[in-house]
């Protein structure tokens, strides 16, 4: 078995498995679109985590932690003199964020994520004190409090040496917040239901309108644009929910995904759609490797010579150029042929990225090239 060709075979397999194939079966509307107005809302807050085992904020470098603690103690009836700045290591200032799900009602719990703001080493073992969570409108929608679950581990010595595993400065509290205010109900009271596709596609919109009309009668649905389908519905909430329960299970064959190539230039990852084609083209691809090595020489003068020891750097630069590789693609070349041609000459994933970018610039790649 030729082990040298194994990475290239794995590349071909990875690209082939990641290929965006055209859908071969019908999909439900609930998998293709979301109901307009049914969405979550971001919540954010600020609070204090206490009970840390010496891994909290260094308050000399984070004065807002002390200020927050003083404010909290003042609300609890404990007065701290203004000229006193306690040096604490078991308290950390944190940011809290969560998502308020659609139709959430007061009293329901939601999960929250807690992240250190200052220089706390770890939040492990800490407890979040009661903190309000606000929406974009500045209103308080939930109250957060509870014991943190931290997956990472961190420790720091007095000399500044530090060791950490994963990210110990971020934790979660399952069911750590309680909803206090419900969102305004935008679902009831309208005579239409709006369906928004996850990805805009005129073919899918047209087929969705036809599928809904076939199931509920002609004129039930109408296309608004390449993303939105409007469906006539009753205003009674129970009837609307019954209609939606049937509507989201209607099946249709969505339109083919557009020909697209996605390239991650940092990692060399390439995802090529199945419908990608290449016009007739020929490419010569070579590479230049530059190696720079640094050595340090010490010049030691003789005894009693009056000279001084000097350190002189010595640099060695070496450039090597590999032979050019010629690729020739006929009209209508497919994904498999492109990958096979590149792998046969032992090219790396980075070479494939460069070739695809060159084909796009030459107008020979009949697909959208997206670099992430």
UniProtKB/Swiss-Prot annotation:
Primary localization: periplasm
Highest taxon listed in the record's lineage: Bacteria
Coiled coil regions in record: none
This protein's record includes keyword Signal: yes
Localization (cell): Periplasm; Bacterial flagellum basal body
Gene Ontology terms describing biological process: bacterial-type flagellum-dependent cell motility
Alphabetic keyword roster: Bacterial flagellum, Periplasm, Signal
Leader sequence residues: 1-26
InterPro entries found in the cross-reference section: Flag_FlgI (IPR001782)
Gene Ontology CC annotation, any one: bacterial-type flagellum basal body, distal rod, P ring
Pfam families, per database record: FlgI
Keyword Signal: yes
A GO term for molecular function: structural molecule activity
Function summary: Assembles around the rod to form the L-ring and probably protects the motor/basal body from shearing forces during rotation.
Subunit architecture: The basal body constitutes a major portion of the flagellar organelle and consists of four rings (L,P,S, and M) mounted on a central rod.
Family membership: Belongs to the FlgI family.
Name listed for the protein in its UniProt record: Flagellar P-ring protein
């Amino acid at each position: 078995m030729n082990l040298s060709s194994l990475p290239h075979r794995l590349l071909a397999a990875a690209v082939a498995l990641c290929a965006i194939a055209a859908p071969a079966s019908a999909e439900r509307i609930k998998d293709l679109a979301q109901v307009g107005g049914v969405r979550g809302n971001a919540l954010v807050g600020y609070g204090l985590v206490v009970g840390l085992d010496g891994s909290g904020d260094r308050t000399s470098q984070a004065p807002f932690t002390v200020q927050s603690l003083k404010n909290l103690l003042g609300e609890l009836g404990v007065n701290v003199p203004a000229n006193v700045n306690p040096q604490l290591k078991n308290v950390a200032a944190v940011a809290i964020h969560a998502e308020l799900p659609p139709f959430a009602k007061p009293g329901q719990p939601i999960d929250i994520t807690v992240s250190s703001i200052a220089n706390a080493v770890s939040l492990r073992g800490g407890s979040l004190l009661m903190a309000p969570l606000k929406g974009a409108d500045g209103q308080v929608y939930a109250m957060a409090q509870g014991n943190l679950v931290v997956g990472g581990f961190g420790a720091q010595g007095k000399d500044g040496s530090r060791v950490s595993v994963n990210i110990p400065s971020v934790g979660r509290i399952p069911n750590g917040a309680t909803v206090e205010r419900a969102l305004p109900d935008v679902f009831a009271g309208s005579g239409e239901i709006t369906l928004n596709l996850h990805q805009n596609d005129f073919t899918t919109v047209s087929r969705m309108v036809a599928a809904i009309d076939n199931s509920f009668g002609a004129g039930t649905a109408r296309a608004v644009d390449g993303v939105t389908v409007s469906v006539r519905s009753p205003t009674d909430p129970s009837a609307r929910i019954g209609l939606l329960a049937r509507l989201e299970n209607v099946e249709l064959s969505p339109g083919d995904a557009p020909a697209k190539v996605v390239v991650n230039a940092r990692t060399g990852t390439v995802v090529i759609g199945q419908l990608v084609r290449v016009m007739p083209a020929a490419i010569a691809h070579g590479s230049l490797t530059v190696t720079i090595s640094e050595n340090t020489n010490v010049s030691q003068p003789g005894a009693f010579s009056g000279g001084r020891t000097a350190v002189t750097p010595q640099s060695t630069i070496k450039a090597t150029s590999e032979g050019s590789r010629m690729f020739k693609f006929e009209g209508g070349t497919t994904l498999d042929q492109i990958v096979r041609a590149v792998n046969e000459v032992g090219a790396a994933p980075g070479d494939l990225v460069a070739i695809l970018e060159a084909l796009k610039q030459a107008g020979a790649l009949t697909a959208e090239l997206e670099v992430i």
